[in-house]
Amino acid sequence: MDPPGYLLFLLLLPVAASQTSAGSCSGCGTLSLPLLAGLVAADAVMSLLIVGVVFVCMRPHGRPAQEDGRVYINMPGRG
């Protein structure tokens, strides 16, 4: 039985990570503390905005469903 592709990828990931040197990032600068705090705050605000939009979109709209007069024997609490 052949292992799935992602399993092979996960097994080879440490090998690929060990091949890269620590200073291989050319042109990368350090992040200042205010910039890092701003990025974290912006991420938190965007996450809350996404959660709010999903909450508003998933709310039931309009009037509630009307109860019908049917008797459901196998459903407790109905009829």
UniProtKB/Swiss-Prot annotation:
TM helices/strands, residue ranges: 36-56
Annotated region (GRB2 binding site), positions in chain: 72-74
Positions carrying Phosphotyrosine: 72
Membrane topology: Single-pass type I membrane protein
Disulfide bridge positions per record: none
Subcellular location field: Membrane
One MF term in the entry's GO annotations: signaling receptor binding
Secretion signal, residue range per the UniProt entry: 1-17
GO cellular component: cell surface; membrane; plasma membrane
Taxonomic superkingdom: Eukaryota
Knocked-out gene: effects: Mice exhibit low expression of KLRK1 in NK cells, but no expression in resting T-cells. KLRK1 expression is not induced upon T-cell activation, while it is up-regulated in activated NK cells; NK cells promote KLRK1-mediated tumor rejection due to substitution of HCST by DAP12/TYROBP. Mice lacking HCST exhibit antitumor phenotype; they show enhanced immunity against melanoma malignancies due to hyperactive functioning of a group of T-cells that share properties of both T-cells and NK cells (NKT cells).
Subunit composition and interactions: Homodimer; Disulfide-linked. Interacts with KLRK1 to form a stable complex, which results in surface expression of both proteins, whereas alone, it is minimally expressed. Interacts with PIK3R1 and GRB2. Interacts with CLEC5A. Forms an CLEC5A/TYROBP/HCST trimolecular complex depending almost solely on TYROBP. Heterohexamer composed of four subunits of HCST/DAP10 and two subunits of KLRK1.
Known function: Transmembrane adapter protein which associates with KLRK1 to form an activation receptor KLRK1-HCST in lymphoid and myeloid cells; this receptor plays a major role in triggering cytotoxicity against target cells expressing cell surface ligands such as MHC class I chain-related MICA and MICB, and UL16-binding proteins (ULBPs); these ligands are up-regulated by stress conditions and pathological state such as viral infection and tumor transformation. Functions as a docking site for PI3-kinase PIK3R1 and GRB2.
Protein name (Swiss-Prot/TrEMBL): Hematopoietic cell signal transducer
Lineage, top ranks: Eukaryota, Metazoa, Chordata, Craniata, Vertebrata
